[in-house]
Amino acid sequence: MRLACSALTALACMFVLAHPSRAQDARSAEPFLRQVYAQYKAGGTPIDPTGPDARTIYDPALLALILTDRKAVNGEAGVLDADPICACQDYDIKTIKLSVRSKGAGRAEATASFHNLGQATVVRFDLSSVGGNWRIADIHQKGLGSLRKALADEIASAGK
């Protein structure tokens, strides 16, 4: 009886670990990012990182940093002088290439490569699953590095 229970437990563990939904988890992040970037066409209206809909794309920790930074810089541009999703102030993104890979349960890393107004741009995202939905946990881009770190550093500097 004990052997049968152990065998069933092992079989159940193998099923859970090999279940296709785990493999598809990171791939489900691509439609999320495509939806985010869909607004970055001429005439589009991307989500304001400090607006009420920001929670639909940013994870709670990054959103808290963005909102705290906004208060800390007292109306100055600061780290967010450009939109971190497109690394731009003006946009007309026509073609985007996305690659996504799993970084463990509920975490993924994505790279977006695109041309915006003739400028080749690469932006990397750390994504986290929040309530079963993908959210941006950090953004990495040339010249900025980690958005989370840049915001935290700016908040610390403003407090001095």
Predicted stretch roles:
Residues 103-107, 111, 117-120, 138-160:
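Low-complexity, intrinsically disordered terminal/linker segments enriched in charged
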